Amino acid sequence: MNKVLISVILAGFGAQLAKLIIYWFKHKSLSLHDIFVTGGMPSSHSAFVVSLTTIIYLTEGATALFSLSLVFAMVVVRDAYGVRRTAGNEGKALKKLFKAHHLKSKDHYAMGHTPKQVIIGSIIGFIVAFGVYFLL
């Protein structure tokens, strides 16, 4: 049984499912498009990589693979919060500018995450990894 793969899949899909449920309660509607929208609570990117790093540590210990996954997680989490959030804010500004000048723009722009969304996603990843490790 591949606990690493199970943990990562459960954390990623679990966070994405939580995001859909939160969206549905907030907007009282849901579409297929909403499954693939980036940004929002919680960060599935953070859940995914924190789960990966945690389960590797639990199964392998402090190995080179763990170190690699830790660096990978730091890059992904930083990207989810920093780079993608900045790009999302710029997308918002461009959309307003296009609207003011009656220009066409795409309906969705990729949003990054707030610190709270990243922390909650990370907690989900951590809990899922521990659950998979100790229950399977």
Residues of each region from the PLM?
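Membrane-embedded catalytic cores of phosphoryl/pyrophosphoryl-handling enzymes
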Residues: 13-20, 32-136
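Helix-loop-helix hairpins and the membrane-proximal interhelical loops
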Residues: 1-17, 25-28
